[in-house]
Amino acid sequence: MPFQIPDDLNRDLMPLAWMIGHWEGEGHGNTPDDGEFSFGCQVDFTDNGGDYLHYICQTFTMNPDGTPAAPLRMETGFWRPNVDTRKVDVLMAAPEGWAEVWTGNIDGAKIELVTDAVARTEEALVPYTGGQRLYGQVEGDLLWTFDRATVDAPLQPYMWARLKRS
C-alpha cells in the first residue's frame, strides 16, 4: 500500500513519517519459562498535529483461521523525535505493570532504541528490567524486534514481527 506524507504533518515528525498508519501481521516470541510462541499483531502510529506520534501495539493469540483469539499483551505511548539531532525519545506503558523511557537514534527508516528507565509495580506480571528494540522498514513492511532482560534472565530476544500497512 503506498504511503503519502500528510501535507500538514508537523515538521518535527518528518523522520518518523514512514511509520504513520495502521500495521498488521504475525510475529514470534520466546521466553525462558514458556518457550517459543506465535502471535498476531496490530500497531498504530497516529498524528494529531503535535510534535509526537501516539503509538499503540496489541498482540494476541490466533485462531486456526488467523483471526484474533485472545489478548496477549498491549502497550501504548508517545514517540517524540528531534529532527535536528536524529534522536528519539519514546514513553511506553503496559497493563502488565510497567512503564518505560526509551532513547534512540533515527537512521533513515531504521530506529534503534534502548531503555533509559523501567518502572514496575509490585504486582508486575514479569520482573522486567530493560530492553532493546529495533524498528525498520523493509520492502514496505514494518519490522520490529524487542530484546528483554528480567531480574531472572539477561537481555535476550523476546518478540519480533513483520507487519504490513493496511
Swiss-Prot record:
InterPro entries: Calycin, Nb(III)_bact/plant, Nitrobindin, THAP4-like_heme-bd. Coiled coil: none annotated. Pfam families: THAP4_heme-bd. A motif (GXWXGXG) lies at residues 21-27. Signal peptide: none annotated. HAMAP family: nitrobindin. Belongs to the nitrobindin family. This is Ferric nitrobindin-like protein. It comes from Cutibacterium acnes (strain DSM 16379 / KPA171202) (Propionibacterium acnes).
